[in-house]
């Protein structure tokens, strides 16, 4: 399994004007009808976007995973990737849920890979459950605006199998990188959750 993240640091050098502005902003802000980006759109939507059919600089984590979801071997490296297709969550979910085979007819090789990825995501999820992971399946509201910018409807965003697949693979990549640096005994920033309060766990149960 390969997880590839755009190598933004190649273009945004430490101490540069772009770096200072990004530090000042802290993060991108997602509003109802627009995004206030942390970085210029020419970067985030251009050379740092993993668009299909073009070479892009990336940071990659390749993981060899067995049938039980255990990582046998891994490699972390700088890479140049050439994406084959731009996929959308709805179409991938339809394929994996057996609702629509249009993606399979159009891109059979990609569809076969997605089926394997879906199987692996299921294995990883079940393994995570056995470790005591709690699944919070919150439905986020999707606010629809009319032409005048006023709220016309509120829909519930459905979290489907494609969303969960990405979550599992990103979790695995993050855990792999964290463990890699842990064993190297190098200074590293870890983003972790504190252990839950036992009384609160009992309330949830």
Question: Predicted regions: what is each one?
Answer:
Residues 1-205:
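Conserved, carboxylate-rich catalytic/transport cores that coordinate ions
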